[in-house]
C-alpha cells in the first residue's frame, strides 16, 4: 500500500509534464488522432521482417554474452555450482539494489538507514515484478527484461538510423551497440536496456513529429532513470 501511495504522485507529476510537453508542441484534441499513426502509407509486411532480424540479432548477442558469463563463473569456481548460484553472482554494482527493490519494495529496502527513492526509479522495478509472476527467480526475470528491452530498443535505433542515413549505417549502429564491451550492462539486472528502449523510441517519434507517442515514451524514460526527464521536457 505504501508503494502505491508513493507511486501515485510520481505518476501524476509525469502526466502533468507530458501534458505540458504536448501543449508546447501545439498538440490539440483535433490533431491527436494524427499524432501516433503516420500520415503516409506504411507497408507493415515490408518493415516487420527487418525489425525481427534486428531484434533477433540483438537478442542473440545478449544470450551469447550471458551464456559466456555464466560459463566463466562455473569454470572459475572451485566447487560445483548450479545455474541459480551462477545467476546470484550477477548481483554486482547497482544490480544488487534493483534486486532488493524488486524483492522487498521501496518501503522495506534501505541502505545505511535511508530509502532509495531519488536514485532508483520504479519503471524497471515494476516490469520485473510483472515478469516475476511467471519467472520467480529475480535475477533471471531481471536479465530477461533487460535483454528483451535492449533488443526492442535496437529496433528503434535501426529505424531511426535507417530513415536518417541508410541501411548500412543502421546495421552498423546496431552491430556496434551490441558488441561494444560495455554493452554487457544491457543484459544485467539494471535499467540500461529499458532506458535505451524508451529513449530510442522517443527520439524516433520526435524525428517523425509524432508528439503524443514521443511524450508517452519520454514519460517512461523519465520513470526509468533520473536523466530521462530530459527527453520529456520540450526544448
Positions of the model-derived regions?
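Short hydrophobic/aromatic helix or loop-helix immediately within or flanking a transmembrane segment
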Residues: 89-136
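Transmembrane-helix signature of polytopic, membrane-embedded enzymes
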Residues: 137-142, 152, 157-179
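Transmembrane alpha-helices of multi-pass, membrane-embedded glycan-processing enzymes
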Residues: 119-120, 124, 128-132, 136, ...
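Transmembrane-embedded, aromatic-rich helix segments that form part
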Residues: 196-197, 213-222, 227-235
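Short acidic/glycine- and proline-prone juxtamembrane loop motifs at membrane-interface regions
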Residues: 187-194
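Alpha-helical transmembrane segments of multi-pass integral membrane proteins
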Residues: 116-117, 142-150, 191, 203-204, ...
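Start-transfer (signal-anchor) and selected internal transmembrane alpha helices
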Residues: 2-80
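Membrane-interface transmembrane helices that cradle and orient dolichyl/undecaprenyl
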Residues: 165-168, 202-213
Amino acid at each position: 500500500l505504501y508503494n502505491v501511495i508513493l507511486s501515485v504522485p510520481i505518476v501524476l507529476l509525469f502526466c502533468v509534464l507530458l501534458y505540458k510537453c504536448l501543449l508546447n508542441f501545439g498538440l490539440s484534441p483535433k490533431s491527436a488522432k494524427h499524432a501516433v499513426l503516420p500520415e503516409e502509407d506504411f507497408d507493415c509486411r515490408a518493415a516487420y521482417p527487418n525489425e525481427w532480424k534486428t531484434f533477433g540479432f540483438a537478442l542473440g548477442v545478449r544470450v551469447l554474452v550471458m551464456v559466456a558469463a555464466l560459463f566463466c563463473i562455473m569454470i572459475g569456481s572451485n566447487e560445483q555450482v548450479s545455474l541459480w548460484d551462477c545467476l546470484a553472482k550477477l548481483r554486482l554494482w547497482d544490480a544488487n539494489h534493483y534486486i532488493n527493490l524488486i524483492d522487498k519494495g521501496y518501503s522495506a529496502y534501505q541502505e545505511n538507514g535511508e530509502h532509495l527513492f531519488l536514485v532508483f526509479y520504479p519503471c524497471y522495478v515494476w516490469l520485473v515484478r510483472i515478469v516475476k509472476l511467471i519467472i520467480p527467480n529475480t535475477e533471471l526475470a531481471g536479465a530477461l527484461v533487460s535483454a528483451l528491452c535492449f533488443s526492442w530498443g535496437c529496433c528503434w535505433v535501426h529505424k531511426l538510423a535507417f530513415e536518417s542515413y541508410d541501411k548500412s549505417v543502421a546495421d552498423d549502429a546496431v552491430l556496434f551497440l551490441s558488441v561494444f564491451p560495455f554493452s554487457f550492462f544491457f543484459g544485467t539486472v539494471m535499467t540500461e536496456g529499458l532506458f535505451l528502449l524508451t529513449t530510442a523510441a522517443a527520439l524516433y517519434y520526435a524525428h517523425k513529429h509524432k508528439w503524443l507517442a514521443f511524450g508517452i515514451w519520454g514519460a517512461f524514460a523519465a520513470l526509468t532513470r533520473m536523466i530521462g526527464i530530459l527527453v520529456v521536457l520540450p526544448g
